[in-house]
Amino acid sequence: LQIIGPREGVKKVASTHILQTRFGPLFLADTTVNHFLSPDDIADITELVAEQVETFNITPKIGLVTYSNFGSVPNGESAQLMRQATAIVHERHPDWIVDGEMQVHMALDPELRQKYYPFSKLGNHQVNPLIFPSLSSANIAYNLLGTAAGMDVIGPVMLGLKKPVHILQIGSSVRQ
């Protein structure tokens, strides 16, 4: 990060892991870079991930996830963080298919989301990036899904750098 540096206009670099799921590719962020995030940081990371998703000719349909659904926990720290980040993304990109804050199962289940939260901007779309409130939650999620569920995992893919970078994790196989 210090040698290559962020590309012009990027305030905070980030990373994503891509998992092959039964719904198609699922991008998780920020899985390896940023420890302490503000709502603006999360909005910036959301933009970087959306840009990466588009490089695969996929329209980003983004869920900002935490332990709360659309204000069900009004005073929780990470719920407030994700709610504020969602508002920033909505303001910057009113035409994007993005919503939050919501629990992961709500983000991944369009029927359930439509039933309980029909106002969601995600509508009946299948979410493809999930944006987490912290490095620890994103890192735990990708490791859990990759290890316990046996999903193929690509990454971390670094986002927002001047040049392409790929980092190998300890114990990476040749396939990874």
Tell what function each PLM region has.
Residues 1-80, 84-124, 128-176:
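Anion-binding alpha/beta catalytic cores of soluble intermediary-metabolism enzymes, centered on
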